[in-house]
Structure formats: C-alpha cells, structure tokens
Regions:
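Short, basic (Lys/Arg/His-rich) helix/loop patches that form interaction surfaces
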Residues: 133-135, 229-270
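Catalytic-site neighborhood detector that most strongly recognizes the C-terminal catalytic loop/helix
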Residues: 117, 175-179, 272-297
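Basic, Lys/Arg- and aromatic-enriched nucleic-acid-binding interface segment
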Residues: 103-155
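Basic/aromatic-enriched alpha-helical hairpins
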Residues: 2-72
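DNA/chromatin major-groove-contacting recognition/catalytic segments
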Residues: 183-188, 196-197, 285-306
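N-terminal DNA-binding recognition helix of tyrosine site-specific recombinases/integrases
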Residues: 42, 71-104, 153
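Short, polar N-cap/turn motifs at the start of nucleic acid-interacting alpha helices
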Residues: 164-172, 241-243, 263-284, 306
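Active-site/catalytic core of tyrosine-dependent DNA strand-transfer enzymes
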Residues: 187-242
Length: 306
C-alpha cells in the first residue's frame, strides 16, 4: 500500500507542485509563491479536477488551457504569466535535458501594451517638483528617481535595500527576482538621495517597510507597493505628465533613454529582460562593470543637466 501511495504522489502534478511551492516559500520568494499558486488554481479550474497526473499535461492540454483562458476574457499578459509559472513548475518536476516539454510552443510572450517609459523632460519635471520635506510624496519621488539612477532597480530591491549593502562607493545587492549580483557605483546624484535618509535609525536605506522578515515583510511590501503606485499617480498629475507613472516604468525608462544615448544593447539588457532567459544571461555575463558604470554616468549627466 505504501508503495502505491508513493507512486501516486510521484505522478501527481499538484502534489509535486505543492512541494516546489513549499520550497520556494522557505526561500522567502513570496511573489513567486503567489504566482505559482494562482496559476495552479487556474489550471485546476480548467481541468475541473482537484488533481492532475504529470502525464496528463500534454501539448494539446496546454493549448486547450490557453484557449479556455482566452474565452474567459483573460488578458494575454495574464495568460503568459500563468503559463510561465506552470512551465517553471513543470520543468522542476519533469525536466530532462534535450527533451521537448508541453509548454514548448505555448504563448509566453509580452503583447504590445501602453507606453512603459517617459522622456528625460518628464524626469526633469519630477526633479523640479516642490514637495514638503519629509512627506510621503517626497519619499516616493526620491524612490522613483533613485530607481532610475540605479539602472532601473526594481521597487522591491529598493524597499529591502540595507545600509550594509553600501560600501566603498558602491551598492551591491542580489536581485530578488533573478538572484543576480548587481554592482552600482554611487554617482553624486545617488549619494545625494541616500544622504537625505542617513539620520533614520534603521538598517534599511529608505523608510518604506516596517516589517523586514518572513510573510509579514512580504505583506508589508505589497501594501507599500500599492501606496507607492498611488503616489506616482499623484506625482504624474502634479508634474503635468502626459504618461501616468507606475513602479514598473523605471527600468523601461532607463533602457529607452540609454538606447537613445547610444549605450550598447548588451549593456541595456541588464536593465531589460528578454523573452529567452538564456539570452539575457549571455548578455549579462558579457557586461564589464566599468562599461556599466560609464553608461550610467553618461545617462545621469544627460538627465540632470540644467
């Protein structure tokens, strides 16, 4: 009987997925946990079942699932997000080198969406906004500008950025999403923003989070991200920007401006993701820290010129 149970669990896609989700949760990658759980629930609704065998996840099954999502009125971005999460789970469960997977030809791209970047003139308008010192709007503006100055650093990495990650004139941290080590030389513009919060008696650089460990920290981060995006909408109106700011816009803005200033594409790839993660990794490995520092210095001088 025990052997039968073990065989059943081994063949259960849902059971294996839960094992992976538990492992990811133990690594405190709560956003990934949320994505995996949401995608898995969606798949089970399509299958009208509480469990699925690994063998039942075929290319036809995945194709049918994506068609079902479309008929449910789910956006292409969400379909892509669900599919990427399920593919990641499947690959961890059933990965075999050189073997095609049911997700090989599934849609996992990014359709054309609303404009995701702003111009240098918009950044200058933000910089010139007169805001009350110590206000939440002033903090949100500082964070947005800081993200831009730091190669489009994601909000989550800024929120959790610790003072001990700054030393010898450089910010060194690991991206929470990819675990890649990032090294950012501290230019004068970056130093100025950090200095505004140097008196805060806390381990984090910015007074954004009140919780820093475990599930509570993730919940706090989600609340603060929502507040931050609300503040960015307010700042957009105050600065009379034609494009509404969002937290996700910073990295695209850095990449777009860098490209316009003839920064090499392989350098820009460190700020923008690729459809193929392997391609991104190849580009990242080829980036010299000095190249990156010089590219960022040129860009910051261009944006902050009077």
């Amino acid at each position: 009987m025990k052997k039968e149970v073990e065989t059943t669990l081994k063949e259960s896609f849902v059971y294996q997925a839960q094992v992976i989700i538990s492992r990811v949760r133990s690594e405190e990658r709560y956003n990934t946990v949320k994505n995996y759980e949401t995608a898995l629930r969606s798949l089970l609704r399509y299958a009208e079942a509480s469990d699925l065998s690994i063998r039942s996840i075929t290319a036809d099954f995945v194709r049918g699932y994506q068609q079902w999502l479309k008929h449910q009125g789910i956006s292409l971005n969400t379909i892509s997000c669900y599919t990427r999460s399920l593919r990641a789970i499947y690959n961890k469960v059933q990965w075999r080198k050189g073997k095609a997977t049911p997700f090989e030809h599934a849609y996992t791209g990014s359709p054309e969406t609303a404009k995701r970047s702003i111009q240098a003139t918009d950044m200058r308008k933000l910089l010139k906004l007169q805001l009350p010192v110590g206000s939440r709007l002033a903090l949100s503006r500082d964070v947005f500008i800081f993200c831009f100055y730091c190669l489009g650093m994601p909000f989550i990495d800024v929120a959790f950025l610790r003072r001990n990650q700054i030393s010898n004139g450089c910010i060194t941290y690991y991206r929470r999403k990819t675990h890649q080590a990032i090294h950012i030389p501290i230019e004068p513009q970056i130093k100025e923003i950090i200095a505004r919060y140097r008196h805060a008696q806390r381990e984090l650089v910015f007074p954004i989070l009140t919780q820093t460990q475990g599930v509570d920290a993730y919940s706090d981060y989600r609340r603060k991200l929502s507040q931050y995006n609300y503040d960015l909408r307010q700042l957009s109106q105050m600065a009379k920007l034609k494009t509404r700011l969002t937290s996700y816009m910073v990295r695209h803005t850095w990449a777009s401006m860098a490209y316009e200033r003839q920064v090499d594409l392989h350098v820009i790839s460190k700020a923008l993701g690729h459809d193929n993660p392997q391609t991104t990794l190849v580009y990242i490995r080829g980036i010299n820290n000095r190249q990156l520092a010089n590219a960022n210095r040129r860009l910051l001088k261009f944006v902050t010129k009077s």
